Amino acid sequence: LYVEQHFGPEAKARMGELIANLVEACRRNISDLDWMTPATREKALTKLGKFTPKIGYPAHWRDYSALVVDRGDLVGNYARAMSFEQDREFAKIGAPVDRDEWFMTPQTVNAYYNPGMNEIVFPAAILQPPFFDPDADDAANYGGIGAVIGHEIGHGFDDQGAKYDGDGNLVD
């Protein structure tokens, strides 16, 4: 419901363009760094080329139909929700990693870089004014959400993100 009302497909497409442009700017900057060895530069460019952006909302929604909710049972609802989530997490054991899973809800005003998946994630709620407006000019959007995009890209190469390769493998 939140996404339907506050984040249309045109906003998702516009955000995709901004991310692609900033990734390209980072690629050019890394290519021009003279203090990096050629091998290090190549690894950085490879990693940057494998960044996966997630914009707005997940490709598929979690199914909560099996969760019993009773308006008159706050404590029971909490206990059932915790049990439901625990069962969902336990079901992941031995299963392939779901690369479509999000670790933040669309209505959260935040963004994150996930080094284990080499992905940058921008929930729909941060893609609203004053950070982002699909009807605003490029200068306003680069000044708003562009700073957030650059910040999240930067995490891929900071003291923690640099420990992972472009496939999300811990290498250092």
Spell out what each predicted region is.
Residues 3-152, 156-172:
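Intrinsically disordered, low-complexity linker/terminal regions across diverse proteins
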